[in-house]
Amino acid sequence: MTDNIDYVEVTINQSVAILIDGNNIERSIHSITKSQETMLNFDTLIPRLLDNRGLNRLIYFREGKNISSKLSDRLHQYYHGSVVPCHKSADIPLSIKATQLASKVDTIIILSGDADYVELVRHLKGEGVRIEIAAVEETTSSLLKEEADYFHA
């Protein structure tokens, strides 16, 4: 007896916010490649992270005043993203923004391997938000990977 099942294509209608700890990601990439010149390729990274889901927000948090206007313009032009300069670390501004966005999105993707985000991940999951971490695996906290709903290496 064979079941003849027709599969119906399901449309995933999820809203995603991508929050980037720029300094953490840059340090990780530079450490792995041993080059200060290596940069993220957002044109391949963002679509891969979204995986056919809708982008609600993209915010790149960067410590310091020397933020590339080219990066800022590119993120705005292609992803309606923004770059937020931070006085010191991005941890607090990123955490505040994630908490503010929790009721507006289905998923938050945090680009950072920093263990400082473990409590934020726990809090957001408690609020019902799916949390994904995208980072360089070799420099990412194992606890952060365990707490996340999904880890993008």
Question: PLM features: residue spans?
Answer:
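Domain-level signal for Mg2+-assisted phosphodiester chemistry and nucleotide/NA-binding surfaces
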Residues: 2-92, 103, 130
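Nuclease catalytic cores that cleave nucleic-acid phosphodiester bonds
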Residues: 64-153
